[in-house]
Amino acid sequence: LDTFTVAAVETITENAKDIGITAKNITDALAIATHANVTISGTLPATSTADIASIAAILATNGKVTANVAAGKAADLITAIAGAGAADALTLTLTDVTVAATDLISLNSKTSVAINANSVKTINGTVADLTKVYVTNKSSFTALGNEDVSITHVIPATPISASDVNSIAKATTGKVTAAVASGTAKDLLAALKDTNGKDDLTITIGDTVADAKDLLALAGKTSKPLVITSVTDVNGTVA
């Protein structure tokens, strides 16, 4: 008589279409092999209440879950895979055109697989959150780097430092929208080296005396007129 121990079961596999209502076929197996990994072939739907209940049941395992989740909006996917963790290998594809950086960060914490963000055309977020998306976790997303970015404020009406704006502009070829903290023309010009005329930046010059060439160069860094109310004298040559 051959015997086996439940501890020997390392992975439970099933096709997405055969998992049963609320993933009963998976949960029944997990009731026996409680620490097994779960691998689902096919694509798990994630739209209805029943779909979400099935995914939640699968993610309740103590092991790693490997699965492809149907494409969807970031907010919906966050709800659908709430029980997932960074060790799970969930393939996620976004359908959003506009998405919050916080949602991207949240999804990234739920999977070890790079998230497909090809549909995204605009990202909104604070500098801290955008930095997590574009710098800290850059490899966690695919197809990012050509979308527009709107930098929001931690405190309303508080401008963003020029260096922070530039770090985001450097990460995308899209348009960057932000209110830049006031500074001297020379300092702003040096800090905003990766911005250009497509960017929608509110740039406020803090000088009372400025060089014409610096003002002209800064004007080429934004699609908006410069705010130069503090400037009383401009030095330069007649062109």
Residue ranges of model-derived segments:
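General marker for long, soluble alpha-helical cores
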Residues: 1-239
